[in-house]
Regions:
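N-terminal DNA-binding recognition helix of tyrosine site-specific recombinases/integrases
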Residues: 72, 80-87, 94-109, 113-148, ...
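Short, polar N-cap/turn motifs at the start of nucleic acid-interacting alpha helices
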Residues: 202-209, 292, 311-330, 341
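C-terminal catalytic core of Y-nucleophile DNA break-rejoin enzymes
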Residues: 3, 171, 215-235, 241-270, ...
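Basic, Lys/Arg- and aromatic-enriched nucleic-acid-binding interface segment
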Residues: 117, 121-123, 136, 140-192, ...
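C-terminal catalytic core of tyrosine-transesterase DNA break-rejoin enzymes
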Residues: 136, 180-183, 187, 193-194, ...
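DNA/chromatin major-groove-contacting recognition/catalytic segments
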Residues: 169-170, 221-227, 231-236, 330-349
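N-terminal DNA-binding module of tyrosine recombinases/phage integrases
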Residues: 3-94, 244
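Catalytic-site neighborhood detector that most strongly recognizes the C-terminal catalytic loop/helix
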Residues: 8-10, 161, 214-218, 320-345
Length: 349
């Protein structure tokens, strides 16, 4: 078995390889192998093999990313690092090499009991990123996260749009902020995290349009405001700070957690109150049940309403936004007039 010795001294490297081969002929765990290698490295080079605890490495990783990435991406890293360390508890202060694929699989399965498959898989990908970076930085011999698979996701095929009667029931069950978020979700077709991220800076009342960059794909969207949304905006308090959020409570939750998971669960509670989910499915079984209706269904509803109104498919795709970040290089191609006609096709709720 070939293994890097992390040294440019050829003689030392050969000695390390020979000693490691000799010491590891018996069955040993990855942790034992790491300790053997550390002892050999110290005896032959007089130096300690580079090590870091999970907490030290993840803290350093986040700090390294701080000047490199957007605030939303940084919040994503911070949130996943914090939750993983919280779950590890005391083990977060042990060497990175002590973490095994079994540990990460257990974390994945724990996460899957309270979140859906997409959120769980997003977590797996984040953890994979942490450990791949740690291996690249020389703190790991093997990457335990690389052996951990994602969970199966069949939720998309079960989703459907809301009916207008169901939307009215949701509006009746929601509080003022959630009613506003439902309106924005329906009339723009954007995802929950993008709606929660909106600030007054995104709204141009002079041109009656909303401008945003989606968190998932980085797509730049400039959309005419439907009449119903224009009317709704006149009832909202803008304040003096253009960077203040349209939906303060949701924005705080998103900023604190880095994901829309808690917001999704809160919306599930609204659906329960509206009689569109059972009480059991809004609890522990939520993550395991493939629901037909969620906040994302507003995106499907917007698509269906536009298609039913005769809006061309290409305009619908531009208005709602492509899923791929590579499509159109982040820009819409439909003209302003076509998008305005699409916006005018929405009914009031």
């Amino acid at each position: 078995m070939k293994r890097s010795t992390k040294t440019t001294d050829k003689k030392l490297a050969q000695k390390l390889a020979d000693r490691f081969e000799e010491e590891s002929r018996g069955k040993r765990t990855a942790t034992q192998a790491r300790r053997i290698l550390s002892d050999i490295y110290r005896s032959l080079s007089g130096e300690e093999l580079p090590t870091m605890t999970v907490r030290e490495y993840l803290t350093a990783f986040v700090n390294r990313k701080r000047p490199e990435v957007a605030p939303a991406t940084l919040a994503y890293y911070e949130g996943h690092a914090r939750r993983f360390m919280g779950w590890l508890d005391a083990k977060a202060d042990t060497d990175l090499a002590e973490i095994t694929a079994k540990d990460i699989t257990a974390y994945r399965n724990h996460h899957a009991t309270t979140a859906g498959p997409r959120t769980t898989n997003n977590t797996v990908k984040a953890i994979r990123g942490f450990f791949a970076a740690a291996k690249k930085d020389g703190y790991l011999i093997d990457d335990p996260a690389a052996a951990v698979d994602t969970v199966r996701d069949r939720s998309e095929s079960n989703r459907r749009p809301f009916t207008l009667d169901e939307l009215r029931a949701v509006m009746a069950a929601a509080d003022e902020e959630w009613r506003s978020m439902v309106r924005f979700g329906l009339y723009t077709g954007q995802r929950l995290s993008d709606i929660a991220s909106l600030t007054w800076q995104n709204i141009d009342t002079a041109r009656n349009e909303i401008r945003l960059t989606t968190r998932k794909t980085g797509r730049r969207q400039t959309l005419p405001l439907p009449a119903a949304l224009q009317s709704h905006l006149t009832t909202m308090q803008a304040g003096d700070d253009p960077k203040s959020p349209l939906h303060p409570r949701a924005a705080r939750i998103l900023e604190k957690t880095g994901t829309a998971t808690k917001l999704s669960l809160a919306f599930a509670g609204i659906l329960e109150s509206a009689g569109l989910r059972t009480a059991a499915s809004a609890g522990a079984d939520h993550a395991r049940t493939r629901h037909e209706l969620s906040f994302h269904s507003l995106r499907h509803t917007a698509t269906s309403l536009l298609k039913d109104a005769g809006v061309p498919q290409s305009v619908v795709m531009d208005y709602i936004g492509h899923d791929s970040p590579d499509v159109s290089h982040g820009y819409t191609h439909s003209g302003r007039e076509a998008l305005e006609k699409a916006a005018a096709a929405f009914p009031a709720i």
